[in-house]
Amino acid sequence: MNVEKFEGAELHVHVTGSISAALVPWWIHWLREFQPELVVNVSVTPAASRFLAVRALRHLANGKVWVDSWDDPDVPPEVNSGKSGASECFLVFPATLDTVMRLAQGRADSPALMMLQLTDAPLVIADTFPGSNEIVENNVQTLKLRPNVEFAPRVNGVRASNRQTAEVGFNLPGALAAANRMRKEGRSGE
């Protein structure tokens, strides 16, 4: 498999509450082995913490790791300006249906959602939707109106609930390639 490295020096991964979140520690480990010089910051929703240990991510990632809650003392103050350290890109990996709908509505009721709403940096959404309908598709199209938003390329995956094959955007190599393309094209929210 030909996988391209992220062409920046720092990125932020926002982990949301899908069962796919259980695989994120492995992907963070893979990313750090594949590109050890890359600084990886991570935010984790409280729902995602049901599927992974934030403490493990603090050992695997080499940037800031925090829980997406106003009560977490580790939330960096720069989230108020759409930043996370010097991150040049944001990945929502995995992106649950609830998270994507909240982003499309402009909600900013958690530190990470506020950061993602305010950022001008490329934002790649690696969705793990259980299904779709007109409302979901309309909200996806609303997000695609933002010049700095793109969805990760879809790949075949297996649903946890029934083991059937389904197309999902939970694709870190594809998300990194999309981020590189967006950066080359100068796609930001400005």
Curated annotation (Swiss-Prot):
The keyword Translocase does not apply. It catalyses: [cypemycin](1-18)-L-Cys-L-Leu-L-Val-L-Cys + A = C(3,19),S(21)-[cypemycin](1-18)-L-Ala-L-Leu-N-thioethenyl-L-valinamide + hydrogen sulfide + AH2 + CO2. It is an enzyme of class 1 (oxidoreductase). GO terms for molecular function: carboxy-lyase activity; oxidoreductase activity. Keywords: Decarboxylase, Lyase, Oxidoreductase. Its EC number is 1.3.99.36. One of its GO terms (biological process) is peptide antibiotic biosynthetic process. Pfam families: Flavoprotein. It comes from the Bacteria. Gene3D superfamilies: Flavin prenyltransferase-like. Involved in the biosynthesis of the lanaridin cypemycin. Belongs to the HFCD (homooligomeric flavin containing Cys decarboxylase) superfamily. This is Cypemycin cysteine dehydrogenase (decarboxylating). The gene is cypD.
